[in-house]
Amino acid sequence: MANRIDHEYDYLFKIVLIGDSGVGKSNILSRFTRNEFCLESKSTIGVEFATRTLQVEGKTVKAQIWDTAGQERYRAITSAYYRGAVGALLVYDITKRQTFENVLRWLRELRDHADSNIVIMMAGNKSDLNHLRSVADEDGRSLAEKEGLSFLETSALEATNIEKAFQTILSEIYHIISKKALAAQEAAGNLPGQGTAINISDSSATNRKGCCST
């Protein structure tokens, strides 16, 4: 997985991980991209990212996952990284009610800075700590439904629903750009050689076989 040669792909999708510090974003990133988990994971300083290439609807997609720091003092830095994102995983910790209460603030910031068509999933992380739960599964689902988001509870420690969360986001992004590509072809009269990048945002969902991203 980590050793796979991934320079050949059909699409590059940028996805941001957002949420309070300590909710497990970095471990979600390492579990999905390297199948690793670190019990002594330190808070992210600034921004870091990792990539993984996988198949989505028969296409080779390179997912570029950005882990943005949740601390208040870094929020001004991370806001710039919303630009170009076509997907987002908004994470809270099911054992810390305050991280759930802050979801709407993160969602508001995301919608202020990101493309209006961005695909968003909400994840209640650390489901392995069910005995310490302070946010009910129904609370998460209810808020996600109210805001029009997908929802899953996840565990980076046990690798529960990590794969499913990203596959869901990537598939939804692909469906959006596929519809846009079809509409563009119909508008162009299905003329051959219309090799353009089909994006839902600023050259971020980039068709490798079309033009280069900016």
Swiss-Prot record:
A motif (Effector region) lies at residues 41-49. One of its GO terms (molecular function) is GTP binding. Its main location: membrane. The keyword Iron does not apply. It is a lipid-anchor. Expressed in root tips. Pfam families: Ras. Gene3D superfamilies: P-loop containing nucleotide triphosphate hydrolases. One of its GO terms (biological process) is cell wall biogenesis. A lipid is attached at residues 211-212 (S-geranylgeranyl cysteine). Keywords: Endosome, Golgi apparatus, GTP-binding, Lipoprotein, Membrane, Nucleotide-binding, Prenylation, Protein transport, Transport. NCBIfam families: small_GTP (TIGR00231). This is Ras-related protein RABA2b. It comes from Arabidopsis thaliana (Mouse-ear cress). The lineage of its organism: Eukaryota, Viridiplantae, Streptophyta, Embryophyta, Tracheophyta.
